Structures are given as C-alpha cells and as structure tokens.
Amino acid sequence: MIIINKYIRMNKIAILFSFFILICCTGYSISYKINGINENKVLSLSSSPSPSSSSSSSQILEKGKEEIKKIKKTNKNKLLYNVAIVDLEPKLEIEQELLTRNNKKKMEMKEEMDIAMMMMKAADRTDQVSTSSSSSSFSEENKKSSSDDSAPAIQSNLTFSGYMTGGEQVCDPKSCNSPSVFTQNYLCNTSSAWANGYVFHDPVPPTGLFVVHKIVVTFTGMFNVIPPTSMVFSLVNGEENAGIFFISKSSPSQCPNCQISFSPRTLPDVDPNGLASYRYGSNNSIIFNLFETDVACIGKVTANIFYGPVAFKVNSVVPNTAPSTGGETVYFIGEQFYQSSQIQCKFGTVISTGTYINSTCASCVVPPMLQSNSTTPSDYNVTIQLSEDGGSSFCLNTTFFIYTAASIPFVKPTSPNYQKIIYIVVGVGIAVLLIIAVGIYFIIRLRIKNKRLNGSKHALPIGINDDERSPLLKTDYKTLFEIKPIDISEIVVQNRIGRGSCAEVFTGTWRGIIVAIKKAKLLNEDDEDFLNELAQEATIMSQLRHPNICQFLGTCNNPPEILIVMEYMPLGSLYRILHDPSISLDWPRMKSMALDIAKGMNYLHCCDPIVIHRDLKSHNLLVDEHYRVKISDFGLSTRFKKHLDKKTAMTPVGTPCWTAPEVLRNDPYTEKADVFSFAIVLWEIVTREDPYQGMPTFQIVISVGQHKLRPIVPPQVSAPFTRLITECWSEDPQQRPSFQEIVKRLEAM
C-alpha cells in the first residue's frame, strides 16, 4: 500500500486528482489482484458494461496514455511518478485486451476508486472460460469460443474437456468390446501407439506477472485388466515429460465392462514460474499418447489449468546482522526477480521501496528504526513483498531478522568532545578485556601444568602419601632416555603408518627386525606435558611382559625428536579390522580376540602396583599377523599399590563411548572402569559397529553417566556371551566381574 505523504506539494495533488476524475469518466473500472498460489482463486479479472460505445472508450483510453506520457515527461516527484506508472500502465494493457474481446458488448459504469488510497485497492473479478472439442484432430473450437461475442469472461482456472473419436470401433475382445457401455466417443489402441490432443486458446494476457502453476488432467475410459499397465504421456507445446500417468486397473469381477474415471492427476514438472514454452494469450496444445501394447480405450479427457503469481525466491540477505540504525543498503540474493514488479521491503511496519538489480538480486534501504529516546535494542522482521498495482501486496518469501543496535540516531551530540570521549571509553574497555583474557590464559595453563605434574598423586587411592608411591610414578621426560636406550645408528625409519596431534608412528627396522617407531618432537613448553605422558607410557610398558601386551623395545634421543621403539603389529588396530567388510570373522576368531584382551587386562590388574589402562577401546588394541590381539597405548594409564577397600579419586580420562559412567560423572573409580570399557569392546566385536553411532559426545556423556544408556546387543548373540556383556557394563562397579573371572567364562564358552 502506498500512502500519499502530506508534504507533497499542492500542484502534484492536483495532478493526481485530475487523473482520478479522468479515470472515473471512462465509466470503466479495471483491476486485478494476485492472492498467492490458490487453486480455487488464483487470478480474477472482470469487466462491467458501460453505456458508452467502444469507440468512445478507445478515445478515453488514448487520453489516459497521453496523460501517462505527460507525467513521465514532468517527473518532478518520484512518489507521484511511481503512483501513476504502477497504477495506470497494467490497467491500460488489460483494458486494451478487454476492449478488443468485448467490442460488441456494452459496458456499464462502476465507480469504486477511493481517493485517499489513490486507486490502489483493486476489486476482485471472477469470470470463467470453458471450451470443448469433439474432434480427434487438434480442434479450433476452443480458440473460436474464447474470441466469440458470447464467450464467458476469464476465471482463475481454465477447464476444457475433449471426447475422443476416430478410433477403431472394435478393439481386442478382451477389452473395449462394448464401447456403448461407457461413452459414444472413444479412442482405442490395440498393439500400436496412438496420439490425440487439443488446441486451446489461453485467455490470460502475457503481462509477466502471473503464470501457469498447475495442470490437472482426468481420464475417463475402459481399461484392460491384464498387465502390463498402460501409460498415458501428456505434452504441453512439445515439452516432454510434462506428465506421466500409470493407468489404474480394476479386476474383472469389480468392473467387467464399466466406465472408469481416474482420480485427477497433476502434471509433476510445472515450474513455480510456469512452463517455458507456454504461450499466454495465444494458442497452446496438449497431446495424450499411449505407448504400451496393452489394450486401453480412452473416452474423455478433462484438463484444468490453474494460474498464479510469479513467485520469486529469496535465499539470503546481506548484511543479516547488526548493528543497524537505518540508512544501510540491504541486498537480497535469490531467484526469479523481475523488473516489471514493484519490490517492497517491510522493516517491522515501516515500508521501504526496493530496487531491482537483476534477476537474482534486489536491494532495499533500511529506514531509521529507533525513536530518539530509545535505549533498548530492537528486533525487526524484514519481509520482502511484491506489489502489483501499488496497493495490494502479498508476501512472497521468508521473513528475515535484522538486529538494530541500541542507539539514539536522531539526537546530535552537543559536546565537541563527544567523539573523543567515545574513543577513550572504547580503548580503555578493550585494554581491560585484553588484560583479563591474558590473566585467565596464564592461570589455566598453570593449573593444567600443576595437575599433570601431580597427576600421579591424584591417581593414588585415598590415604596414600608420597612415600608409598611407586618409583615408576615419579618418571618425567628427562628420564625417558634412560629407559632401554637405543643408539640412533641402529634404527632405520621407513613408512609412516599413523599420525596424532603430538606424535607420528612409522615402520622401520632395528637390528634386522621390523618395528614400530613413535616419533615425538619437543617444540615448546606445552609439549613437555605430552612428553611426560610419553615417559610414563614408556616406563609402564618397559616393566610389562605378557603375550597380549604390545612389547616395548626401547627409546632413542635424536634432538629435537624422541623415538620410542615398539613391537610392530602388521594388521593394525582391532577397530580397523572390525570395520573392514572384506575381513571375515567367525565365532572362534571373535572369541579368541576377546580372550586375548581379557588375558592382557587380567595381567595388568594383577600387577603390583596395579595398572589401570583408563582408555581401553578397539583403537588401542593392535593385531598381529596371526590375529592375536595385544594391548597398547598406555599414555593415560596409571599405577598404584593395591588397596582393594579404597577407590581412586582420579581425573576423568578416556573416550566417552567406552568410558564407565562413574568416570563420566567424575566419581571415584577403581579398575572396574576398565571392565566396563571391555564390555563395549565385546559389543564392537559381535556387531562390528561404532557404539552410540550418530550421537554427539555431550549426549553420550549425559545418557551413559546419568540415564544408564547402553548399546543394544543383537538377538543372534549367544545367551552366555550376552550375559557376560551386560554384567561387565553393570551400573554398579561391584557387580562387574573381574578379568580373572572373565577369562574363565570365555574359556568355558
């Protein structure tokens, strides 16, 4: 809606008023309104008889065109110019069309324009065109009826029906043998294809503002009940694949010789902005083909064509964030913008006229949004609209959000030092924030460093002091090179087989045997913490001797690199094997793998001091060429003396999918946390899937730690194995079996 500003000069109001009187004198009221995509009321045009002759109407029409030219030539006021062009030109184009079609019909006067709205509210008008044909060839009756004096007026949808004739009078005996049962006229195919169609005249003038949105076709006839299904293929002006319809069949008992009317079928490929080859205001054709060898008789075809507005699409708005206090240009990126429309942007209740740039871009200027005393941020919905006649608008696309910063844009500062004060305040604020951020950073680093340095102390059972700690817990990276030192000249590094955030793993040789080499670099202070963990891993592994523990061979100092030499496992991790569909795993092999893991963990839990792995998962279980599984990656492991009546108060570690609920809750825990992780590994072995697949980490932590979520064991898994899994991941750690018991139960299966 365009509202006339009270500040327009009086001579411009006079021109508008004269223009209004001129239109009223024509005795003619023409308007059209687009109401969105509505199947029943999409487009409406109407005309009313006038007592004046067609020649006088034509003269008035010419005068109206001359008046537009004068206003364009003057062009002293942009608002006045927009009102005149948007309001008159579409109406004059449609008026010319209606005068041509109704040159023998008298017209009556109807005055509905309102001067305050400047004739921008259009009246709905409803008409109807219905044409029919009775020839098997393309009929011209539709074209004649649409241009005849007695032709009905235009309606929102165009409907026509055609009766098929010209086919064979007797079809195959199994179908269409009694054509008089269902209709007088029909087309019947036997073993060859047929084509039939109609030419119809489209009554909608090509204004570019509304297009064909939908075509619904209904077929009536008798169809063979024997497969294959017949297929009707519809074309609109040669556009292929406009519609494919599979004919529904009825059984002979239900419909031995009857007329069947399909449910209406909609052509699926009609674009929201119409068919490319469709000719508005001119002749069009629809063809129906039957290509199958099945027998079918078509008696009647009805097509219903629905029109609607051109629907442009907005995909994004730039900028879409704040601050915005008015005056900024906002660009809307989308599709199907067209120049003949008047694009409007509504910022809340404030309207801003849009600017057409091209078919994919338009812009609007943000109006001043805040009141002079406003101190609260305001949110505004930006709605893109298309106004066809300047007064009736309809929403076409998404509502966008623009945040307007709290400010007072209309009050000019009185102090000459206003900007200087602002700069000082902003500068001080930024400096304070930087100081706080740097302080927080160093505090966090200090806490992390202290926690890692004292990690072994926190890993002890409650009540154990420093004197009771094992010497292995006091290891740092400075003693790493004293653990089974290897001379660099004995090592040949070959191919990289793995990479982490702080280290890389290579294959290589040492004294003629193939080994795995973990290579780490000490680049800065932060890496020192990682190397302390690496030293702890090497210290623990150097003391372990078991067939199911990955063998530690030694360390090598090659500044700035540190090398840890380990036993090479050619098949890689258990995780890789379980997720490789080309590797077949039968029950004996799966049981053997589970038993290997249980034996290795039982050895760790029987050590003195006991070793808690804390990160047991399929990624940290390596497999040799004989499918023997060995436990590795002890970077998060810890050792403490046995106090079976105490629980540890250790920092939560591990991977959430495999971590026990008490660890996720940051509760004290024991070596039974490893038993829970083992249960998840058993589930991986029998399912060969990822636990809690698709769930985000935070949801796993909450669901497992608080709501007792567990993976689902497949029903095909044997009862003893299922029972072992469920006991191992019991909520109560005391209910979980020890690895010594697990080994016995697996050996008995």
Swiss-Prot record:
Its EC number is 2.7.11.1. It catalyses: L-seryl-[protein] + ATP = O-phospho-L-seryl-[protein] + ADP + H(+); L-threonyl-[protein] + ATP = O-phospho-L-threonyl-[protein] + ADP + H(+). The keyword Signal applies. It is found in: Membrane. Residues 124-153 are annotated as: Disordered. One of its GO terms (biological process) is phagocytosis. Pfam families: PK_Tyr_Ser-Thr, TIG. Glycans are attached at N157, N189, N283, N358, N373, N381, N397. Residues 32-423 are extracellular. Its main location: membrane. It comes from Dictyostelium discoideum (Social amoeba). Residues 1-31 form the signal peptide. Residues 445-749 are cytoplasmic. InterPro entries: Ig-like_fold, Ig_E-set, IPT_dom, Kinase-like_dom_sf, Prot_kinase_dom, Ser-Thr/Tyr_kinase_cat_dom, Ser/Thr_kinase_AS, Ser/Thr_Kinases-Pseudokinases. This is Probable serine/threonine-protein kinase drkC. The lineage of its organism: Eukaryota, Amoebozoa, Evosea, Eumycetozoa, Dictyostelia. Keywords: ATP-binding, Glycoprotein, Kinase, Membrane, Nucleotide-binding, Serine/threonine-protein kinase, Signal, Transferase, Transmembrane, Transmembrane helix. It is an enzyme of class 2 (transferase).
